[in-house]
Amino acid sequence: IEQLKTMGCNAYRASHNPPTPELLDACDRLGMVVIDETRRMASDEAAMAELEALVRRDRNRPSVIAWSLGNEEQAIQGTATGARIARTMKRRVNALDPTRPTMAALDQNFGDGVSRVVDILGFNYRTPQMEAYHARVPTQPILGSETGSTVSTRGEYVRDDARHIVPAYDTEHPWWASTAEEWWTIAAERPYIAGGFIWTGFDYRGEPTPFNRWPSVASYFGAMDSCGFPKDNYWYYRAICSRTGTGPAGKGRRSPSGSTPMWTGSSCS
């Protein structure tokens, strides 16, 4: 959490399950606000018990600002069934904590089903669709619940598929995602977008996109690697969020052409 704050973050989205009490202790102490997320969007007895336990456990936390009811539930999120489930969950949350809003993180079906029930609508990666949605539903708060997802290897600047290396520049991402600069340019120019949560702050075990095969066993999405060492996007976010000036220029192996582009992050306009 200290590393994220140094980068310029002021909010943490738990995904896709409740965070540990120790993490929330750190957020309470360090001043990081949190969107607290239950494990699954469902209204069966077990799911409702999990939701209730989450709210009861964390409702007195000063860091918690909203309750997320689910993430990318494609089978139900745009349906009447999904809306009924979300209403049931929202009623339970409101009964236990009437002071905080509810949210869901969706990657499609904006304007249908669940999106009509929750107080805050989270957009996963569909940042370009937020302007049109706001024009249709101007009273609903919206934010980027997952944004970015540039893939990068710390300290490397030439792609090498044989070694499972992607360059650390803010250039490569899966088809559904965007660069840091692309999503932030949209959000920064539209005050009705309440910021965004990048995927992800740190690399993590699993989802080794773009290679998805051995020996890659960890993700490339983080602004920091799994040990907390900054990658290049860290300095971009730090420049735009903490106003600390420029970050260090990238350095790396020379490309086959004999030259390596140099990038730097800056808060100057």
At which residue positions do the language-model features occur?
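Extended substrate-binding grooves/exosites of carbohydrate-active enzymes
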Residues: I1-S269
